[in-house]
Amino acid sequence: ITNDFNHALARAKQENKPIFIDFTGYTCTNCRWMEANMFTQDAVKDELNKYVRVRLYTDGEGELYESFQKLQQERFNTVALPFYAVLDPNGVSQATFAGLTREQSEFVGFLRRNPSGEIAQK
């Protein structure tokens, strides 16, 4: 799902799945690196498949993009990109990950956090 947070939230509730928010930007080089090099790794893909995924662009022109930047700022106190957040099916924040990492294990660990915020066991 791209640029439709409300649709992602509704789908997460319907499917009882957590939400993975990818706050990204059209001009974000580190975002493209994560998409091309981290999200394509099998272990990461396996974890991402457990989520309702939504990509929210924050650097476009217009109210829609401004609303996503405002959402990121108000809920997570940052406008840095890339920025990733995990929410439960009710939209409650569970975990965040800021920036780029080249360590698959670090990112997979973030994705495996359970609703209590602890690292889930394999």
Where is each model-derived feature located?
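Proteins that catalyze or organize thiol-disulfide redox chemistry
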Residues: I1-V52, L56-K122
